[in-house]
Amino acid sequence: MKPHTDEPLSDGTRVRNRKGLISRKGVRRCGVIAAALSAAVLLSSCMPQGAVKEKRADQLSLGDAVIAVRLSQGKFSAGLPDPPEDNWIVLLDAQGRGQATRIENKPGSAVMWTERGLSFGAPDKEYVTTDQGTQEIDVKHWWSSEYQRYSFPDGRIAVLGSGSESGIRVDVIHPNGRIETTEIPDTSGPVGQCGQHIVGITDTEDSESIRSAAFEAYAAQSGGDMPENVAAVIQIDDPDGDVPRLLAVAPAIDGLVEGWMSVPCDGNVITVPSIQQDDPAAVRSGKRNSLEGVLVLQRWDLSTGQRTIIPVLDEAGQPIETDQDNNLSGVRTIRVGDEYRFVTEKGDAFAVDVTSGKARHLFSIPSEKTFVPAVFQVSETGVYALEQNDDEDVLTLSYQPWDGGGKRVLLTTGAMSRYLVERNLLMGYMRSVESFALRPGWDGGAQ
């Protein structure tokens, strides 16, 4: 995104297409993490290969691990055989020692560290790793890819992806290993967590299954003229028969492109950063890019059923413009007080007041020269960035607080180089990071 000034802000990501469920990130960023520290800066030399022991997935346990990383399948190198189509899950302790296991490739899949343990999945299995070992759960319906994971206070884990009929699918995994699967066909839109449930925002053009119920609900609510298209908040899990439950409805707004529902509800209120297109008609005719517009907040109050659109303005009171290269796709977001704080995939950090829409550009994280951008995670206090030095296959974890103080290097290590890059006469490929997660309560000495 970029304020209405001469100085552009870099965010080379895309918001999902209006017809897509959630924006896909295409080629993920390269990098992986290895050791951790007890001081603000730790430089560890390249660990021997024995520092990481390879095990079967069902033999993993958390032990002293503080960091978990999921590596993608190998990326192709011209003139060499096809790279391996699998993923690595790596667990590392504060000294760079750890465990690694190979599982089947599942594009877009995340590792998620919860109070229950570490959650990750393959196309046909789900895993939960704890201090006692790994629970391996068979998945009845095979997954081709994954979009997001969510954790509930009662220990349940929800996995979101695409359904068999180009719709939305959610698997809810109970602590005893039971899996409840919900599929909503022909439905798209941003999806997120709201209390004990998974909800989404869609409309009657993007979801045929809600069409009749949505128009009926709007007619009962308004009593006025019927719009051509009705927007709705729906509950994805626990549907009402074959139709998702409607939580709120409102007239659809032409050219309103939802972003990423990356922050849970605040009570009964859902706030979603979105884009209002400059010229929806020109977008439909192919003359304008669908991401050209301004940033707004779409705010739904489920207790009243009302929707409000709040313009997002920079510190000079000007709209924040979006385009193909500067938008909301893939941002990492967290709520801190009355603000959404987020970092783009190029390291630009912002704060937006969820009530007024006033925005602040906090900082831009300087990045070393790498083949691909860093991978980010956010906490209430700041941003963690994971970067790889392409020449040396060295990995760096850094931290920058939201309130300033500059970028702090937390660790640098080469212990994972053999998992990142394979170079020999018969095979050459590079892996990228699908995701990484820090153990709850561990900050690497950042505070």
Language-model region placement:
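Surface-exposed loop/turn elements that mediate protein-protein interactions on large endomembrane-trafficking
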Residues: P48, A78-K106, A122-S144, G163-D186, ...
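Short beta-strand elements that form the blades of beta-propeller/WD-repeat-like
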Residues: Q59-D82, A110-P123, S151-S164, P190-Q221, ...
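N-terminal "mature head" segments of proteins
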Residues: K2-P3, G31-S166, V170, G428-Q447
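Repeated scaffold domains used in trafficking and secretory/extracellular systems
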Residues: K53-D58, E104-R116, W142-D154, I184-H197, ...
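Bacterial N-terminal signal peptides that target proteins for export
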Residues: H4-I33
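C-terminal hydrophobic structural anchor segments
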Residues: V372-T396
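A detector of low-complexity, intrinsically disordered, Ser/Thr/Gly/Pro/Ala-rich segments
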Residues: P3, D11, G20, R149, ...
